[in-house]
């Protein structure tokens, strides 16, 4: 069974394209003047499930003194929800040049923090206090962003939540005299290309707006209220039963892919998660049964359909006893049900539940396991290599996953796992210090040991400021 499970996960990781983003496509031919896309991600802090900041503007600074604005409309972004994944924030035309830094104007931080000592877990919300509101932060790039005429460049920004929110020696959030959480944003920014491993959009989900099958494209209402055109081609992988010709609203769709020069996204993968308008998505905090013996899950709700928006940023307990459809994101093969079902929902997982919402009652019909990120430090001396990059290592995580496991988390890797800023599993085996690591993939129960383990498509050495 262990061998079968491992094979199924290798197949799953390959199909999801979370190994190294190898399903890249050539940019389209409809070039505009030089353009820049912006993606955001985060490095999570334990038990913080929501960390929103309003980005008032993002400005590129050219080495000759000129500037170019890539975001001018205030946009509220919850970086904690990204869970180590990359989401598109902006796309704009700029003057060709060599840009050496970016200035971010931030405002209105809000923090949602889970208290796992309560039963059920309780949610605390804090207003954050910046050094000044709004706060302006200029970040130098490790190397210049060179934007050529008719070219396309990317700006990757990462908010380090661990360092941005002040905590005491016990890990509790520090409040000022007004009861506000002290926030000093720590941002890492770098120039990237759409073809780079860290230039790929890995977390884009939204509602289907329209489909143009003749043009091999559709429009998605993505995060932050922006509509994005998604292009597909013969290399785009759809989940089973779906293609550009039978897409129709209502539908909630997941996409991974790369920006093109015209601002559209060339999709390497398209997943129709559900054709239902009602859904919730977030982190599992507790799994158990109610008084009737029905299986129920308690989760922090990060996203919902338009009809359930009042549930956002709340903790809800949902009866899932009648659910029979269990899926894994961007994975649709005969092994799916062997990997994820009602017996394998675990604390810390990121899941999506689709169903109906009538008279304020949510009736779930399907559950999908989503990709997620996990931050921690290497447990030195606990690295096993089976063959090449196939093996595992232990990661010390003081967040929800570490809480669920009750100690270091086993991270399984494969020869399709992409090691970013690392040479591979052999480097981890030779490390003598507890270096920080970010893993991205799936959190699942091992069917042999019964323990919760992480199955990584990406292992990265996070940027250090």
Describe each region flagged by the PLM.
Residues 387-391:
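Short helix-loop boundary/capping segments
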Residues 16-19:
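C-terminal motif of bacterial Sec signal peptides marking the signal peptidase cleavage site
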Residues 21-308, 314-384, 399-403, 408-465:
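A short, solvent-exposed, low-complexity linear motif enriched for acidic/polar residues
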Residues 9-14:
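Hydrophobic helical h-region of N-terminal Sec-dependent signal peptides
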């Amino acid at each position: 069974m262990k061998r079968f499970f491992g094979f199924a996960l290798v197949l799953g990781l390959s199909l999801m394209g979370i190994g190294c983003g190898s399903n890249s496509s050539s940019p389209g031919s409809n070039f505009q003047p030089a353009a820049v896309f912006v993606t955001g991600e985060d490095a999570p802090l334990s038990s913080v499930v929501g960390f929103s900041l309003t980005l008032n503007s993002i400005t590129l600074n050219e080495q000759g003194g000129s500037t170019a604005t890539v975001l001018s409309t205030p946009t509220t972004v919850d970086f904690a929800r990204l869970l180590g994944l990359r989401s598109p924030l902006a796309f704009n035309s700029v003057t060709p040049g060599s840009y050496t830094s970016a200035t971010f104007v931030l405002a209105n931080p809000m923090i949602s923090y889970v208290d796992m000592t309560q039963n059920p877990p309780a949610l605390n919300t804090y207003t954050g206090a910046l050094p000044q509101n709004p706060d302006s932060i200029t970040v130098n790039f490790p190397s210049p962003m060179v934007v050529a005429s008719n070219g396309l460049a990317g700006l990757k920004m990462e908010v380090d939540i661990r360092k941005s929110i002040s905590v005491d020696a016990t890990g509790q959030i520090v409040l000022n005299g007004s009861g506000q959480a002290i926030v000093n944003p720590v941002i890492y920014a770098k120039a990237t290309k759409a073809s780079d491993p860290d230039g790929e959009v890995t977390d884009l989900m939204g509602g289907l707006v329209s489909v143009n099958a003749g043009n091999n494209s559709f429009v998605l209402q993505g995060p932050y209220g922006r509509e994005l055109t998604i292009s597909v081609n013969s290399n785009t992988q759809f989940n089973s039963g779906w293609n550009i010709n039978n897409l129709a609203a209502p539908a909630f769709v997941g996409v991974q892919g790369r920006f093109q020069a015209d601002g559209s996204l060339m999709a390497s993968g398209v997943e129709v998660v559900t054709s239902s308008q009602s859904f919730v998505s977030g982190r599992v905090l507790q799994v158990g049964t109610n008084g009737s013996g029905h299986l129920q899950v308690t989760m922090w709700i990060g996203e919902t359909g338009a009809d359930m928006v009042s549930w956002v940023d709340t903790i809800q307990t949902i009866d899932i006893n009648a659910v029979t459809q269990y899926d894994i994101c961007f994975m649709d093969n005969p092994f799916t049900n062997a990997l994820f079902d009602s017996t394998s929902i675990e604390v810390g997982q990121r899941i999506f539940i689709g169903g109906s919402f009538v008279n304020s009652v949510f009736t779930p019909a399907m559950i999908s396991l989503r990709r997620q990120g996990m931050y921690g430090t290497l447990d030195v001396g606990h690295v096993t290599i089976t063959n090449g990059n196939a093996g595992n290592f232990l990661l010390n995580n003081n967040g929800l996953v570490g809480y669920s496991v009750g100690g270091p988390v086993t991270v399984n890797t494969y020869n399709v796992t992409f090691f970013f800023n690392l040479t591979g599993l052999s480097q981890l085996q030779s490390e003598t210090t507890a270096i920080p690591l970010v893993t991205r993939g799936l959190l699942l129960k091992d069917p042999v040991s019964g323990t919760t383990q992480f199955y990584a498509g990406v292992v990265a050495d996070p940027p250090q400021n």
